[in-house]
């Protein structure tokens, strides 16, 4: 087990016990503890399990690994939902970066690389994706042959790589060493590089509603939970400054609400989700109407940042 002695954002040693919960999307009774920094409100798992132990929580039945197929006869609806997320993300890139055929786009933690596949449809850019495992693409190599996909760590990226766009879609909350990662990415970037980060927002309404049952904890896979204030400090400390924070994120916020409700219910996540679809769909429609009248974060946030000018 790995114990943190201080906040990784502000270096404060004064932390307070926040809550405990058991592993999510997993069967087990072991409890994990989360603490909160008294200065910047960063929330973190402490102690953290070793990376070797962490593999026990990424089994083949892990829902993100199963993807749309987990929804049985409703698979096409799930695929459409993922396409909408990928379309929102590429639209965001067009708005803030305008990628062209000279651009290099790097997706960290690419998983099943449908986002890069969508980028290939809209842009003529060079597309790269890295992950700690090839689980997301190894069974569909022909489908993704136009992408440069590798099993590697951020530390392995070459100093002269110089991507124009770097994306971390729900990666940073899993990272054991966010400072090291962000600093490394700044070191390989150029003055025009834009960084896109999406993470669960600890300040969101869904977290306040579900507390320790909030699916954003995703225990024990998520080691840090960020809020707008502390993620800005973290980025500034490592060579980046924020251009904009999109409080609603790109993923349907109802997903976090639904997963939180299912954790309370005790859903067997290894089962087919087919029987859950109709209730999920009805809940999503109701939630969508409520969201039309607010800009308050209800789950995730997307941060767009640029490299600080005085860094080479």
Describe the function of each predicted region.
Residues 179-194:
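A short glycine-rich, Lys/Arg-flanked "PGG" loop and its adjoining helix->strand segment in the class I
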Residues 174:
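Phosphate-binding active sites in nucleotide-utilizing proteins
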Residues 20-21, 30, 163, 206-211, ...:
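Short aromatic-enriched loop/helix-cap "lid" or pocket-rim segments at secondary-structure transitions
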